[in-house]
């Protein structure tokens, strides 16, 4: 298959994204918004948004697609999936459901970062949330994405398929 690399024109987003404290934050928001726009314009079925600071284990994509097919068909509903089992999701004693995927179990979560797989249908349905995520630096950054999970199912694997290599010491991953 052909792979298209889409250049990022920051000027396209100058009047859309609120002025930020630094260029890096603006660039991150612009890049994310362009990714969401490409998914909305060109996505057909499943859409996978992947940040550049993750290490993915070899079975990740196969396991996610097979588990998506199994779980979404069992519950007759489109879902969101994260490839990482984030440490920060264990900070609160929140109830979760365990689902059987292809070769591992998955648990329901109510927060994610910006690396996730979903459907074009859910991207369209919650476009305002995706768009709002990119207009300013929110606290948490994924505030509007996390609002979606009040109505939709988001899951992460029990035994992570990816490792988030963040540049800070935090519960979001390893530094």
Where are these regions (language model features)?
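C-terminal catalytic/acceptor-binding lobe
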Residues: 120-121, 125-175
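Conserved beta-strand scaffold positions in the cores of enzyme catalytic domains, especially
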Residues: 2-7, 80, 154-156
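Conserved glycosyltransferase catalytic-site signature
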Residues: 25-33, 110-114, 120, 135-146
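Short, surface-exposed amphipathic charged segments that create phosphate/polyanion-binding patches used
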Residues: 17-23, 95-101, 170-174
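Conserved catalytic core of nucleotide-sugar-dependent glycosyltransferases
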Residues: 46, 55-129
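Short, solvent-exposed loop/turn segments at secondary-structure junctions
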Residues: 10-14, 25, 53-55, 86-89, ...
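Active-site-proximal specificity loops/subdomain of glycosyltransferases
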Residues: 1-44
């Amino acid at each position: 298959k052909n792979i298209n690399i889409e250049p990022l024109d920051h000027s396209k987003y100058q009047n859309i994204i609120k002025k930020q404290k630094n260029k890096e934050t603006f660039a991150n928001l612009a890049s994310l918004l362009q990714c969401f726009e490409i998914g909305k314009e060109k996505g057909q079925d499943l859409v996978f948004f992947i940040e550049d600071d993750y290490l993915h284990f070899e079975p990740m994509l196969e396991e996610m697609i097979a588990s998506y097919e199994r779980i979404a068909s069992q519950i007759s509903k489109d879902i969101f999936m994260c490839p990482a089992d984030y440490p920060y999701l264990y900070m609160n004693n929140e109830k979760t459901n365990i689902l059987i995927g292809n070769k591992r179990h998955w648990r329901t979560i109510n927060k994610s970062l910006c690396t996730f797989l979903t459907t074009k249908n859910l991207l369209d349905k919650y476009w305002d949330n995706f768009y709002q995520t990119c207009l300013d630096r929110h606290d948490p950054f994924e505030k509007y994405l996390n609002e979606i999970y009040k109505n939709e199912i988001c899951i992460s694997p029990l035994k992570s398929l990816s490792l988030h290599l963040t540049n800070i010491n935090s519960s979001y991953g390893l530094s």
